[in-house]
């Protein structure tokens, strides 16, 4: 549950740039850019003064909040004369639209929007440069729902058409024997709304459930729901990518030192989260309050935090599986994957592993 406040943090976050919420399906091409390996061209960091960063009010994006609140972005990018300008999105498709429109340089996004950006641009628009989080998504339903059959004829929700939770929900429903189309019509209706609107609609009884990321799953539980499916239970070892970090390919080619400085800050944030989880939660809440005027209820936040594993491992195999799920439910064509050259070229972990090597850490494969 979220609480409202008029208090504003003056430490690191300023006014947000507004980005139009265009339909992802309308984006049939990217701004292009070279796809040469990172570090193969010289950077001109002096040519830019701002790194435009996109992320969500989701717990799986906590490394961004921690890096802002603890000053890691300011310190590491500041040595290059670059500052971070954050932009908040509800879900991945909107963030991908901003990447395509050259309105954002780097973004924390889920696997399915990453796949859509990669395939729609035929492998030209983006690169995955790091992981950020695993886990932290659940299907929470009303107390009178005890099985999938109880959902027939009812309406459930996900944050946005084609986003990671939307694919997971439709795939799971179809695997359980329901018939749900890509547009959400079928024996169970799947609608889309912002995470905060989902919590409100669930509380008023307009929704019977929702597949959402943390902390919204815990908010639904606090509103009287219970977990029908914890997505951790659907993946081997409970590991599956919920958030990766992607960069525009052109930005990576032109400014590899800026990207490396960004990744250094993100690695520092991950280390801080591991060592200081309580303060990291406070950083997330403070950052969220500064950006949105809302914060997560203190009774909810620790429970939500426990559902997430923060990691720089992009967990590639689970992204590939998520893409197969999207194909299965009609939200992606296999020919689009093939047309982009598969998923191996999507990943460029060169700079991440340089950062890890400096910290005496083994490379991420």
Write out the residue ranges for each language-model feature.
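Bacterial N-terminal signal peptides that target proteins for export
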Residues: 2-16
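C-terminal motif of bacterial Sec signal peptides marking the signal peptidase cleavage site
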Residues: 21-26
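Bacterial signal peptide processing site
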Residues: 28-31
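Short, glycine-/small- and polar/acidic-enriched structural segments
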Residues: 35, 43-192, 208-211
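Short, solvent-exposed loop/beta-turn-alpha elements that line the ligand-binding surface or hinge
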Residues: 74-81, 181, 233-237, 306-315
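Pocket-lining segment of extracytoplasmic ligand-binding domains
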Residues: 184-187, 197-289
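Secondary-structure end/capping motifs
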Residues: 253-334
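Conserved C-terminal helix/tail region of periplasmic/extracytoplasmic solute-binding proteins
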Residues: 324-365
């Amino acid at each position: 549950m979220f609480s409202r406040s008029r208090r504003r943090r003056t430490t690191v976050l300023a006014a947000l740039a507004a980005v139009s919420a265009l339909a992802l399906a309308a984006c049939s091409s990217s701004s292009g850019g070279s796809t040469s390996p990172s570090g193969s061209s010289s950077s001109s960091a002096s040519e830019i003064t701002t790194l435009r960063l996109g992320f969500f009010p989701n717990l799986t994006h906590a490394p961004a909040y921690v890096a802002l609140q603890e000053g890691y972005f300011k310190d590491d990018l500041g040595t290059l004369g670059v500052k971070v300008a954050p932009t908040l999105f509800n879900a991945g498709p909107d963030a991908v639209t901003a990447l395509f429109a050259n309105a954002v340089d780097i973004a924390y996004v889920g696997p399915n929007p990453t796949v859509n950006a990669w395939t729609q641009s035929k492998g030209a628009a983006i690169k995955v440069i790091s992981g950020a989080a695993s886990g932290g998504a659940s299907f929470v339903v009303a107390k009178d729902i005890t099985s999938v059959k109880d959902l027939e004829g009812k309406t459930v929700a996900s944050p946005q058409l084609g986003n990671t939770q939307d694919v997971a929900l439709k795939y799971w429903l179809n695997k359980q024997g329901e018939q749900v189309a890509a547009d959400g019509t079928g024996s169970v209706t799947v609608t889309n709304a912002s995470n905060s609107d989902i919590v409100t609609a669930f509380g008023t009884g307009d929704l019977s459930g929702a597949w959402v990321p943390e902390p919204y799953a815990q908010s639904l539980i606090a509103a009287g729901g219970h977990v029908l499916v914890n997505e951790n239970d659907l993946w081997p070892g409970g590991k599956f990518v919920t958030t990766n970090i992607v960069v525009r390919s052109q930005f990576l080619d032109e400014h590899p030192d800026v990207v490396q400085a960004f990744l250094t800050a993100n690695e520092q944030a991950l280390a801080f989260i591991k060592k200081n989880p309580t303060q990291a939660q406070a950083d997330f809440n403070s950052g969220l309050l500064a950006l949105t005027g809302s914060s997560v209820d203190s009774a909810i936040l620790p429970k939500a935090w426990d559902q997430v594993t923060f990691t720089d491992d992009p967990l590639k195999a689970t992204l590939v599986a998520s893409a197969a799920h999207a194909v299965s439910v009609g939200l992606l064509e296999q020919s689009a994957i093939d047309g982009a050259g598969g998923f191996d070229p999507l990943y460029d972990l060169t700079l991440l592993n340089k950062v890890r090597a400096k910290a005496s850490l083994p490379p991420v494969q």
